[in-house]
Amino acid sequence: MNKKFILPPSEIELFQEMIKGTKKLPQDKIRHQTPRKKVTHYPTERLQQEQIDASYYFSDEFQPNLATEGPMRYLREGANAYELKKLRRGDYVPEFFLDLHGLTQLIAKQEIGALIAACRREHVYCACIMHGHGKHILKQQTPLWLAQHPDIIAFHQAPKEWGGDAALLLLVENDDIARR
């Protein structure tokens, strides 16, 4: 495939004869550029600080009062109980997913903090955390951590299509939501 297509000299002469006397047209058209969307790039230090700030609320010693019967669920005091019902029914579709499989507790805390910070930054209301079954360490700890965070409105065991009892759907408070 290294063969180049070469015109015979007679063809080149014919072409030059045909274009003899032509003039180059001046460029007189204005090219309009489409306006670009402003992409906000957050500095890495800011993202790391948000992650640290969000994971600040998680303590391993604190034991919130969570429901022991039925599926894992939590509703922040003063929040609308109908939101929890909509979570249970699967009315909310999570926009962000976090998979904690294979993570240590420390890294899982940091990742959950980063997820909550990202939800607030991107104005995402519903997210899904997949903690898995495993040795039940993250399955037990994740709800305890989430119940401590002030930006979590509610969480409920996910419906089967989002992970069933190996995942949690959570509602994150945003500035947009607080104004409603």
UniProtKB/Swiss-Prot annotation:
Keywords: Endonuclease, Hydrolase, Nuclease, RNA-binding, rRNA-binding. Its EC number is 3.1.-.-. Belongs to the SmrB family. PROSITE patterns: SMR (PS50828). The gene is smrB. InterPro entries: Smr_dom, Smr_dom_sf, SmrB-like. It comes from the Bacteria. Acts as a ribosome collision sensor. Detects stalled/collided disomes (pairs of ribosomes where the leading ribosome is stalled and a second ribosome has collided with it) and endonucleolytically cleaves mRNA at the 5' boundary of the stalled ribosome. Stalled/collided disomes form a new interface (primarily via the 30S subunits) that binds SmrB. Cleaved mRNA becomes available for tmRNA ligation, leading to ribosomal subunit dissociation and rescue of stalled ribosomes. One of its GO terms (biological process) is rescue of stalled ribosome. The keyword rRNA-binding applies. The lineage of its organism: Bacteria, Pseudomonadati, Pseudomonadota, Gammaproteobacteria, Enterobacterales. This is Ribosome rescue factor SmrB.
